[in-house]
């Protein structure tokens, strides 16, 4: 049973499969209001959305991987995983009343833990309470107005949030990624986009945001095995990658005559980029969001990171690809979170949930993540709303 000084939290002390390395601590030290910086808030966590990238890190690196004291000595490492969550504000830092009056105690919020707390201090979100920066939080506000098609339609309830607290838990990092990556592509109405990994959580959000950018005249092609689901979020066509191998050969054969104006890879398949010249238009961008193909070892992850940095630098005369490349990860901030929520409020963006697990069953949730068969977000209910 947690108290004001202790809480339930899942922790891990070594690299490996999360389903095998995490341990539930019923008396983990709880953060308190006394620890808050001026721009930080104490949150009671209700839901945590799991992230495939964090699973890759946990398999390859120990907790607090960027903490210098741990790198240079054998000091015990301990970490709480994950960073995306939703919950209720318990306390606010001294600057919050003047800088963020929308963030007050008892307000429902969605957001992310600061990278410093997760990767250096080992204080992630899979716990009953977390400290998070105001810049990476946004309130889950009720709809401000009721819009109806006619007088007989009741319209949405203005007192109800546009999305549930459960669904909101997966919108901060993934939602910001989808919005920011579409900005990077500079796509316009009528363009053609390929999304690899269309049934991943970030893939489905990216497709939905892209539909708003491209309009009905644009074309969105995605890869995946659940055609109905991927089409339901806005894709025009779905390629079953299990039936079309290698995928890059299928794309070369069927899309070289009208190349894509951008490719967004949510999985991290290197061959898609190295062979993309025929099916990605000159001057257009290939963006990788995924690391699902990285080998789950320290050296495997190091090799993956090295390749991400070298891909855009390798000269064409030495075998490089004559197309621009960028590896991108989310940069959650207030402005982008606001854009995400406006899309949600207009009914243009929704979170697809693969499965929901109780706090005690987090190991099973990680097994689902490790299977790489999830279609949408895997969510852990930390405590009741």
UniProtKB/Swiss-Prot annotation:
Keyword Lipid biosynthesis: no
Record's keyword terms, sorted: NADP, Nucleotide-binding, Oxidoreductase
Entry-linked SUPFAM superfamilies: GroES-like (SSF50129), NAD(P)-binding Rossmann-fold domains (SSF51735)
EC number, as in UniProt: 1.-.-.-
CDD domains listed in its UniProt record: MDR1 (cd08267)
Binding site for NADP(+): 64-67, 199-202, 223-226, 241, 289-290, 372-373
GO terms for cellular component: mitochondrion
The UniProt record lists the keyword Lyase: no
InterPro entries in alphabetical order: GroES-like_sf, NAD(P)-bd_dom_sf, PKS_ER, YIM1/Zinc_Alcohol_DH_Fams
GO function terms (MF aspect): nucleotide binding; oxidoreductase activity
Induction line: Expression is positively regulated by the oxaleimides biosynthesis cluster-specific transcription factor poxB.
Enzymatic class: oxidoreductase
Binding sites annotated in the UniProt record for substrate: 156-163, 309-313
Pathway: Secondary metabolite biosynthesis
PANTHER family associated with the record: ALCOHOL DEHYDROGENASE RELATED, RETICULON-4-INTERACTING PROTEIN 1, MITOCHONDRIAL
Family: Belongs to the zinc-containing alcohol dehydrogenase family.
Record's subunit section: Monomer.
Function: Trans-enoyl reductase; part of the gene cluster that mediates the biosynthesis of oxaleimides, cytotoxic compounds containing an unusual disubstituted succinimide moiety. The first step of the pathway is provided by the HR-PKS poxF that serves in a new mode of collaborative biosynthesis with the PKS-NRPS poxE, by providing the olefin containing amino acid substrate via the synthesis of an ACP-bound dec-4-enoate.
Name of the protein in question: Trans-enoyl reductase poxH
Source organism of this protein record: Penicillium oxalicum
Originating gene: poxH
